[in-house]
């Protein structure tokens, strides 16, 4: 499998801590920023200033209400955010139709096992497929194929997990538009050999399953 550009996740924290995290990882080609805190505007503006060349993806984890989304859209556009993941609680998805987002929306919590893709809000142009959520690699690949049939882009995501779980997600991500595969970095101890992150890319180590 070809190496993939590596995306680093900036976890929701204080604005100062998030900007420092972005500064420390400003060379990463992609930053996935968790928002839904007390001062999202200052956080994303500071992160963009700290990492001017990084592609930015924002994940709100259902953390905004419709008015907060409307308020934040101009800020996200100013920062050049490429994708916005699950801004509203899934139960409020129908309200997305009345909001001019102008950024690619990705469904995560709204895209759950056995949900019907055709019942997703048409505001979504992307779905986050996680092997943990789909039930394994085979089902995840089927979910990806179905999403494509409905004209949706695909992100392959992950939970906090070892490199042994990231490896099949890495295989699926070869066919995805976006990927979020840094869950193994949150572990105090990973499997050895672990997934490799070098020069802004993530790749498989030799002998991962040995």
Model-assigned labels for residue ranges:
Residues 26-29, 50-54, 74-82, 99-105, ...:
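Glycine-enriched alpha-helix->loop->beta-strand junction motifs that scaffold or abut catalytic
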Residues 9-11, 29-38, 55-63, 79-92, ...:
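Catalytic beta/alpha-barrel core
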Residues 31-35, 106-107, 128, 132, ...:
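Long, contiguous hydrophobic alpha-helical segments, chiefly transmembrane helices and signal peptides
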Residues 157-210:
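Flexible C-terminal active-site loop/helix
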Residues 36-52, 64-71, 88-100, 114-116, ...:
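Active-site-adjacent beta->alpha loops and helix N-cap segments on the catalytic face
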Residues 141-142, 146-158:
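C-terminal EAL-domain catalytic cores of bacterial cyclic di-GMP phosphodiesterases
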Residues 1-56, 63-70, 75-78, 191-210:
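N-terminal capping/lid subdomain adjacent to the active-site entrance of alpha/beta enzymes
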Residues 138, 149, 189:
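Histidine-acidic metal/acid-base catalytic patches
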